[in-house]
Each structure stands twice: as structure tokens, then as C-alpha cells.
Amino acid sequence: MSDARADEDWEYWMKYSFNARVNEKVALFIKPQFRWRDDFNEFYFHRTWAGATLKVLKWLDVAPQYSYKTSKHSGNHWPPENFLALDLIPKIALFDLKVSDRNRVMYGLDDYVWTYRNRIKIARPFKKALWGHGLTPFIADEGFYNDKAHEFYENRAEFGFGTKIIKNIELELSYIFRSKEKKDKWIKSHILCSLLKFKF
């Protein structure tokens, strides 16, 4: 897809999260993601994260993980990419708000590039809303930096809400405004995102 078509494009990102609790401090997870672009018409991206979340302190989670990614290139070529990553996620409660600050360091095993991602999320749970299923509106912002570009090269501003469908299944719907630098030009896109969470 050309840069002209890519700017102001609409995309759909479909995400899943499968979490299996080992004990009070350890949970294993697998998180597949799929993306469509060109006004939802072209499937172009898949990524799966797999790892563990460790509750190191009451206010701090640490998550070592591996990621497999493939995306569509010219000629319908889908080269695989592999990454190792570590998340450090401090969390605090501020009045009725829940605030988290995910700091992710990624290393590309194929291109040897280090990437740092920072995502700050603020959520306000309403536990009795939707007939007891609960409703949690949130806003978030995530910035990207890597040692190849040596600069901040992408930002995602997001707002949405989450709710519990049944006891172990939650749904999150959101809108993301993404700005990404490409050839000294900032390409903007509008993203509709769904996240289905399964907890075991």
C-alpha cells in the first residue's frame, strides 16, 4: 500500500489474551494479534506474544516474553521476525483511578535492534455498571523509540472501555490514533481494536 493510501487509513486490530494462573504471583500467557488495513480490506500482520507475568511487588509486575511476528511485504512476501522482550509495569491506585506505566524493552533477534516502548494507561472502573458486569473506561498513550532510528518514531493515543462478559472472559473495545514516521513523514492511521481476554 502506497504512503498516500496509508495516510489516514482505517485499520482493524483483533487481539486475544489467554492467561493461566500458576499461583498468586505467577501467570502464563499467550497473546495472538491480527491486523487488517486499507479500510479493513487487507490482512497484513500477525504477532503472538508468549511469556509469564510475575508479581514481584504489590505495585510492580515483571513480564519476560518472546514474540513471533510476520507482516506482508511487496510481492506477498511474509518474512518472519523474532523478538525477546521484558515488561516492567508499576501500578498505582489514585482515588478511583487505576494507573499503570508499562515499560517494554524489546530486542530483535533478526535485525539486532533494541526498541523501547512506554504505555501509560488510566482507567476508571464502575463495578456495578451493565447489570453487574462492570464497565471500565480508559485512556492510554504509547510512545516508541529504537536505537536504529535514534529517535521517537511512533505514537499511539487510545481510548476505550472494558467489560466482563462472564466470569473468566472479558472484552475490551478501543479506538487508536497512530502517528508513525516513515521517510521523514508522519503517517496517520485510525484503528478500531478489540481485545478478548480469557482467564483460567
Where are these regions (language model features)?
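Start-of-domain marker
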Residues: 5-61
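Residue-level signature of outer-membrane beta-barrel architecture
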Residues: 20, 54, 90-92, 124-128, ...
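Solvent-exposed loop/turn segments connecting transmembrane beta-strands
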Residues: 5-13, 36-45, 73-80, 107-115, ...
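Detector for outer-membrane/organellar transmembrane beta-barrel domains
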Residues: 90, 98-143
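Transmembrane beta-strands of outer-membrane beta-barrel proteins
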Residues: 28-30, 62-64, 97-103, 135-139, ...
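Transmembrane beta-strands of outer-membrane beta-barrel pores
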Residues: 32-38, 66-72, 92-94, 105-109, ...
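Short loop/turn motifs that connect adjacent beta-strands in outer-membrane beta-barrel proteins
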Residues: 5-8, 24-25, 59, 93-99, ...
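Outer-membrane beta-barrel "beta-signal"
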Residues: 85-88, 188-200
